[in-house]
């Protein structure tokens, strides 16, 4: 069982603040709006073909934040990937504008995007950042109200 005392304090604080703001149960859309409000710009989730080794990535543009999810994922994998990328924003792993994207707006990004460059540019997290995002994403899953896409009861009990 996962005890809140075993979590790093930054993950505890982000989870507590998020649940305090959104309530014990919330949707992915609620979480996306919460992140957008905290960062002061919209957060868009896009699906696109990505390499098999990459299920998602995120970056910050001048006027919006973007999460790119590999097209064709199962609903549960899609949710887990979205939550992982959302966790990067919540944990401040993503600056207000991603290095190299200082000139990109949503419009210019969508017109002339090179997803290989995007993936390379957004795959520079060190292992602790990835571990922290995965831990927070797993805990956020416990609060997501998405019916069949939420974590099964037996798995939820592992984290209580």
Report residues per predicted region.
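General N-terminal targeting signals
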Residues: 32, 60-62, 84-86
């Amino acid at each position: 069982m996962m005890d809140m005392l075993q979590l790093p304090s930054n993950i505890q604080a982000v989870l507590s603040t998020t649940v305090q703001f959104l309530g014990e149960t919330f949707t992915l859309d609620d979480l996306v709006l919460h992140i957008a409000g905290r960062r002061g710009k919209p957060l868009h989730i896009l699906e696109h073909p990505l390499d098999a080794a990459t299920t998602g990535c995120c970056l910050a543009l001048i006027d919006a934040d973007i999460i790119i999810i590999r097209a064709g994922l199962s609903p549960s994998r899609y949710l887990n990937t979205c939550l992982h990328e959302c966790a990067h924003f919540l944990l401040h792993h993503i600056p207000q504008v991603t290095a190299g994207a200082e000139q990109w707006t949503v419009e210019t990004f969508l017109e002339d995007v090179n997803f290989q460059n995007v993936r390379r540019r957004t795959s520079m997290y060190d292992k602790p950042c990835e571990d922290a995002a995965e831990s927070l994403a797993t805990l956020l899953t416990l609060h997501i109200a998405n019916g069949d896409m939420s974590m099964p009861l037996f798995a939820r009990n592992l984290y209580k």
